[in-house]
A protein has these predicted regions:
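C-terminal motif of bacterial Sec signal peptides marking the signal peptidase cleavage site
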Residues: 11-14
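A solvent-exposed, acidic/Ser-Thr-rich amphipathic alpha-helical stretch
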Residues: 84-106
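A structural signal for short loop-to-beta-strand junctions that line the ligand-binding cleft
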Residues: 80-81, 92, 132-136
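Bacterial lipoprotein signal-peptidase II cleavage site
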Residues: 16-24
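Short, well-ordered surface patches within globular domains
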Residues: 29-88
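Sec-dependent signal peptide recognition
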Residues: 1-8
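Disulfide-stabilized extracellular recognition modules
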Residues: 98-182
Length: 182
């Protein structure tokens, strides 16, 4: 899958848990943006291959995870948030701003499925698949995401000083070493 962008970065491995176990967020109807994030994530879970013996539960929106993601995105520092608690995290960056939307970000993460071998629980040599496995991790039930337009700390260097930072935090986390996602 080619992304219609000048440049994109996806961190090589979607990180698993940090510290502090987040409690589930209260059930509230998601905003239209939150719903768009869910609408981008849940088809990936429904389409996981090989098909899980029982369907993966649909993700719901976590306002707590979204708040953590938003606070981290506001830093405009392209790295994982060490203070995210026990949340998994996917991050992405693109430039120039507007060259990618939230569905494109999730689709980029999901496209890593082509490099994941479920039978051996490995990624193809030289490829990454941790973003995909976090999305389809069976025990992950909630997600909260954020996006920030940034004008400093560009991971693309001086050629693209303006960039976008995308962060999704997952509750409970996935990507435990040695475990399959489902």
């Amino acid at each position: 899958m080619r992304l219609p962008i000048v440049a994109a970065l996806l961190l090589a491995v979607a990180c698993g848990p940090g510290e502090d176990d987040p409690s589930p967020s209260p059930e509230t109807p998601p905003s239209s943006e939150a719903q768009a994030w869910l609408d981008a994530h849940n088809p990936v879970r429904r389409g996981a291959q090989p098909a899980p013996s029982t369907p993966l539960p649909a993700l719901t929106w976590s306002t707590a995870a979204a708040a953590v993601a938003q606070a981290w995105a506001a830093n405009c520092t392209y790295q994982h948030n060490a203070g995210r608690g026990t949340r998994g995290e996917n991050i992405a960056a693109n430039a120039p701003p507007g060259s990618l939307d939230l569905a494109g970000v999730v689709n980029a993460w999901a496209s890593e499925a082509q490099y994941y071998d479920y039978s051996t629980n490995t990624c193809a040599a030289g490829q990454q698949c941790g973003h995909y496995t976090q999305i389809v991790w069976r025990d992950t039930l909630r997600v909260g995401c954020a996006q920030r337009a940034c004008t400093s700390n560009s991971p693309f260097g001086s050629q693209f000083p303006n960039w976008e930072f995308w962060v999704c935090d997952y509750e409970p986390p996935g990507n435990y070493v040695g475990q399959k996602p489902y």
